[in-house]
From Swiss-Prot:
Species the sequence originates in: Drosophila melanogaster
Pfam families attached to this UniProt entry: ING
The organism's taxonomic lineage, starting at the top: Eukaryota, Metazoa, Ecdysozoa, Arthropoda, Hexapoda
Bias (Basic residues): 131-149
UniProt-listed InterPro entries: ING_fam (IPR028651), ING_N_histone-binding (IPR024610), Zinc_finger_PHD-type_CS (IPR019786), Znf_FYVE_PHD (IPR011011), Znf_PHD (IPR001965), Znf_PHD-finger (IPR019787), Znf_RING/FYVE/PHD (IPR013083)
Chief localization: nucleus
UniProt site (Histone H3K4me3 binding): 234, 245, 249, 257
Protein residues bound to Zn(2+) 2: 248, 253, 275, 278
Role played: Component of the Enok complex which has a histone H3 acetyltransferase activity.
UniProt subcellular location: Nucleus; Chromosome
Comment text on domains: The PHD-type zinc finger mediates the binding to H3K4me3.
Superkingdom to which the source organism belongs: Eukaryota
An example molecular function term from Gene Ontology annotations: methylated histone binding
Gene that produces this protein: Ing5
Name of the protein this chain belongs to: Inhibitor of growth protein 5
Length: 285
């Protein structure tokens, strides 16, 4: 129920209250006047009774008893008027108290509804933040997998190119060695035919062997994959998103997302979580 409906219902209940209070106050005033009139009459009768009672032989026994009964009746009337006035005052008090209790109950009910709505809104807000955190973590994992896959493909391509280069170098080296060996054998046969000269052993150039061996056995180191300069950075380490991350529940947090390891977490904590900077700022307040 909205506050406007509460107010409207309460004003409807108060609409007849002034009329009832006015009627009760008028009756109380009339009863008070009657009681005061009775008390004045009692004073007058009492003075007259005491005056005649003081005179010797001025009042008979029957007259004295009659005057006493009259004074007693006046006292009864005054008491009746006073009792009616007290009852009417109690009734008026209960009438006002009823409206006050009704207002208190309506206010308590209205406050309960406000707190319930606030709790519901807070729960929905936390659920939205949690969903954003899970989505951010999922996107971070997907981005990390894509980067690893791209890096692996690039390393594989460079490895294949290096292998092809090494194979070409080895083939060239082997071909050179074969041709030189053939020349050596031809020269040796010629020397033998000419007069039995000693055979020459033709050695392959050591520098060529060393260069071929180095090219075949020491491929170039794989370079690190370059980082996209346009990718946003997070956390206290100012690095890109990777692995498990947690979001700060302070909506004004300048960093917003943090790596678990950088803030000393292994699992997501229950309830709200604030980063170290926001925690210090909250303590200062």
């Amino acid at each position: 129920m909205s506050s406007a409906i509460y107010l409207e219902n309460y004003l409807d209940g108060l609409e007849s209250l002034p009329t009832e209070l006015e009627r009760n106050f008028k009756l109380m005033r009339k009863l008070d006047d009657r009681a005061q009139t009775a008390m004045k009459s009692i004073d007058s009768h009492a003075k007259d009774f005491m005056r005649k009672l003081g005179e010797n032989g001025a009042m008979s026994e029957d007259e004295r008893r009659e005057r006493q009964e009259d004074i007693k009746a006046l006292f009864g009337k005054a008491k009746e008027y006073s009792d009616d006035k007290v009852q009417l005052a109690i009734q008026t008090y209960e009438l006002v108290d009823k409206q006050i209790r009704r207002l208190d109950n309506d206010l308590a009910r209205f406050e309960g509804e406000i707190q319930e709505k606030a709790s519901s809104t807070r729960a929905k807000s936390e659920e939205v933040v949690a969903k954003k955190g899970r989505k951010k973590t999922k996107d971070s994992k997907t981005t990390g997998k894509k980067k690893k896959s791209a890096s692996s493909d690039e390393e594989t391509g460079r490895g294949n190119n290096q292998s092809n280069a090494n194979s070409s170098v080895n083939s060239s080296s082997n071909a050179g060695q074969g041709s030189k060996k053939k020349k050596s054998k031809v020269n040796q046969e010629k020397e033998t035919r000419k007069g039995g000269a000693q055979k020459k052993t033709v050695e392959v150039d050591d520098s060529e062997k060393e260069s071929c061996h180095t090219a075949a056995t020491h491929p170039s180191d794989v370079m690190d994959m370059p980082v996209d300069p346009n990718e946003p950075t997070y956390c206290l380490c100012h690095q890109v998103s990777y692995g498990e991350m947690i979001g700060c529940d302070n909506p004004d947090c300048p960093i917003e997302w943090f790596h678990f390891a950088c803030v000393g977490l292994t699992t997501k904590p229950k309830g709200k979580w604030f980063c170290p900077k926001c925690t210090q700022d909250r303590k200062k307040k």
